[in-house]
Amino acid sequence: IFSPVVLTVVSVATAAMLALTSVLCGCSSNAESSSQSGSTTPATVATDTTVKTTGEKIHINDSTLGEIWITELDGVPKNTLNNDNFTSDDTFKYYSENGKAASMEGIDISSYSGKIDWDKVKKSGVDFVMVRIGGRGYGSDGKMYSDDSALSYIKGAKAAGLKVGVYFFSQAVNNDEAIEEADYIKTLLGDETIDFPVAYDWEIIKDDDARTDSVSAAQATACAKAFCNRVKELGYTPIIYSPSKELYFKYDLTQLADFDIWYCEYANVPTFYYQF
């Protein structure tokens, strides 16, 4: 999470209706939409490398995966959040340190959210908004698409005094596609400025065949790095959105230390072992 404060995100279903979730909820995807075609160049496909670990086995009770064992990664900071410092009301979850607020509250939205009354959102206590700017379809052609409501959401949120970032639903299968996605975000934003990060949202597709099914952990990690490095070159702050499954089993976090994690978990308190 963006140090030094904890950021909590809830979803918007309709205008100013905020659904209670846990620390940092999930984003929306779009299977196949129009616009940009996917790259087929395999030149930057990563090869497997040896993940650096301490060798220690750690038992974790993950709210999504259940009880699992992981091998501790070497040099990756651990989660130091105190679960006793989390409180909640009917809408948000909060985090405090030494009796003082240490969190910001936010929402993630896409065109599925419909029309939004931004003044109501601001008055409800929301501090920031993460807007879906677009994504890539998970079908074989991997077409990129824009979210038709993104720019109007960004303008409306900024006018209401909210901080704004964006996220992109990725299904990149090589570094070239990840870089292509970052460049596409810049094209979509144009001259529109944002003050929160650009999030890379690469997810394992459930209950359907996907172009990313055979992507190795090494390649998934390389794609995340390529995207984030390109986002930095474009003048934005990158962040990696992910639930625990991808973080534990698809990303080598020892190679992603330069980038913050936007962690997704639907639970009363976060159970992820590493810092986010």
Residue ranges and their predicted role:
Residues 51-106, 110-113, 119, 254-276:
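Functionally critical loop-and-helix segments that line ligand-binding/catalytic clefts
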Residues 20-45:
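Sec-dependent signal peptide cleavage junction
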Residues 90, 110-119, 143-156, 176-191, ...:
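Alpha-helical scaffolding within the catalytic cores
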Residues 14, 18-22, 50:
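Hydrophobic core
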Residues 188-198, 202-276:
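Surface-exposed substrate-engagement region within the catalytic domains
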Residues 2-17:
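Sec-dependent N-terminal signal peptides
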Residues 84-164:
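N-terminal carbohydrate-binding/catalytic regions of secreted carbohydrate-active enzymes
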Residues 105-109, 129-131, 164-168, 198-200, ...:
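Hydrophobic faces of well-ordered beta-strands that scaffold small-molecule active sites
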